[in-house]
Amino acid sequence: MAGHSKWANTKHRKAAQDAKRGKIFTKIIRELVTAARLGGGDVGSNPRLRAAVDKALANNMTRDTLNRAIARGVGGGDDAQMETIIYEGYGPGGTAVMVECLSDNRNRTVSEVRHAFTKTGGNLGTDGSVSYLFTKRGVISFAPGLSEDTIMDAALEAGADDVITYDDGAIDVYTTPEAFGEVKDALEAAGLTPEASEVALVPSTRTDLDAETAPKLLRLIDMLEDSDDVQEVYHNGEISDEVAATL
């Protein structure tokens, strides 16, 4: 959608769909448990856990619930067998797609992911087939109406990598994964509340989708997100305002 932050729009759509399915808490709890198990329970020294906590709070999870999930991760238990698996492939229109999963059964997960790609005209790729098009970055998105100079000054002083302003006034701040929490804290301390924020795989290039291929990509995303094992779906598909109006 030209002229404004594609990142926030894509993530908001996903959040709304996940919430509608009642899956988002299950997925966030899995991520909290795994992040705490792998990196410890201190959000100050565990960027992955910090990102998961931010996502939990943004989706109105109670502190009690998220603290219990962190405690489960630190203490081990049944969740200790969960592993992070990343699949990559080509979606409709040649779009590059990355699928982040948390699973205790690789065979089940890859079967579900492959089925989604096949049903929508894409194909599951090999390791490295599209991952070179993505970089893990912190993304902090602001809605139109805030001062570009204020956000830029606060973000760059706190260690952000880049600040992008869109035609409609929306602003995205990009950071390294390690600096994500510090930059977000600095922005919030300056009275700047983000519309969305997370550590994510950000594409370096975009693939334009027409009115025929765009619905197929959206169907692929829906099918992937229907899997309890799938945590995040990232892609480089570009849907123009004109095409979006036909969907």
Swiss-Prot record:
It holds the Pfam family TACO1_YebC_N. The lineage of its organism: Bacteria, Pseudomonadati, Pseudomonadota, Gammaproteobacteria, Enterobacterales. Belongs to the TACO1 family. One of its GO terms (cellular component) is cytosol. Keywords: Cytoplasm, DNA-binding, Transcription, Transcription regulation. This is Probable transcriptional regulatory protein SG1259. HAMAP family: Transcrip_reg_TACO1. It is found in: Cytoplasm. InterPro entries: Integrase-like_N, TACO1_YebC-like_2nd/3rd_dom, TACO1_YebC_N, Transcrip_reg_TACO1-like, Transcrip_reg_TACO1-like_dom3, YebC-like. One of its GO terms (biological process) is regulation of DNA-templated transcription.
